[in-house]
Amino acid sequence: MSKNAYAQSGVDVEAGYEVVERIKKHVARTERAGVMGGLGGFGGMFDLSKTGVKEPVLISGTDGVGTKLMLAIKYDKHDTIGQDCVAMCVNDIIAAGAEPLYFLDYVATGKNEPAKLEQVVAGVAEGCVQSGVALIGGETAEMPGMYGEDDYDLAGFAVGVAEKSQIIDGSKVAEGDVLLGLASSGIHSNGYSLVRRVFADYTGEEVLPELEGQKLKDVLLEPTRIYVKAALPLIKEELVNGIAHITGGGFIENVPRMFSDDLAAEIDESKVPVLPIFKALEKYGEIKHEEMFEIFNMGIGLMFAVKPENVERVKELLDEPVYEIGRIVKKDGASVVIK
């Protein structure tokens, strides 16, 4: 068999080497205390003692970005989808009270295109910088026959640490707690199968009246907001009883994940800062209004359950608008009641 047999099978080893060289500078941006070793080892290493946590509990999360990737491919814009991937992982573990420490990514593609994959990893690195996590490992798999030449998939894995006494597991959320929300940056990274159906006949260049001058494609690919730096000070001061990351399933599925079965969340819809894109989706997709809250974040990406006496301190620490959108009540039917 000839020496280029692997290339004849559709796998370009040299392109793989080029990707590694291209991404080194991006990975270097994510360096933080605790990282041991560099790229190229069989496993990434992290020295947990550097965190200063006395009773460490490791908390991990994994996620992808769903079919938002198909829009990145359609619009040939690959430099922010990596940030989405990081956000989906680190926002989940911050909801458990963890400080994210390190991240690993996995990219699978039909054809290794170094310039495009560099953009993807650059986005991952940017997400890591925003989260304060180190990108300590990853895998790029060229899989001809599994994926089309222009296609790729992306997944991420985040590990964080929490003081055992500061774990947020829902057990402290109580009747009377106030629900505070932080704004989302857009759709984030869920519901895109529906989004793509609604806008299937659009080029992405359109400026819809609802979108306040922005092109549709820019709004649809707006990166998922990362909440780590906003939430960590609140966790360290033990100011929040519960945290909900509003992702797939919207308010209805995600808010109840932060409290026990005997409680419910009462949401004042008038206090939710609904973003223009959600109004457009509801209109052009002819989606029932109540269903929107079952699918999308509607403008709130992270929610806290806070004792009334801690509300002002939380607002003081958060250097941004904080939306007081509801409260925790005794359950009498549904787990989330939107009024």
Swiss-Prot record:
Pfam families the record matches: AIRS (PF00586), AIRS_C (PF02769)
Entry's EC annotation: 6.3.3.1
Superkingdom of this protein's organism: Bacteria
GO biological process, one term: 'de novo' IMP biosynthetic process
Catalysed conversion reaction: 2-formamido-N(1)-(5-O-phospho-beta-D-ribosyl)acetamidine + ATP = 5-amino-1-(5-phospho-beta-D-ribosyl)imidazole + ADP + phosphate + H(+)
Compartments in which it is found: Cytoplasm
Gene Ontology MF terms in the entry: ATP binding; phosphoribosylamine-glycine ligase activity; phosphoribosylformylglycinamidine cyclo-ligase activity
Xref: InterPro entries: PurM-like_C_dom, PurM-like_C_sf, PurM-like_N, PurM-like_N_sf, PurM_cligase
Main localisation: cytoplasm
CDD domains: PurM
Pathway membership: Purine metabolism; IMP biosynthesis via de novo pathway; 5-amino-1-(5-phospho-D-ribosyl)imidazole from N(2)-formyl-N(1)-(5-phospho-D-ribosyl)glycinamide: step 2/2
CC terms in the record's Gene Ontology section: cytosol
Keyword tags: ATP-binding, Cytoplasm, Ligase, Nucleotide-binding, Purine biosynthesis
Xref: HAMAP family: AIRS
Similarity comment: family membership: Belongs to the AIR synthase family.
NCBIfam families: purM (TIGR00878)
Official protein name in the record: Phosphoribosylformylglycinamidine cyclo-ligase
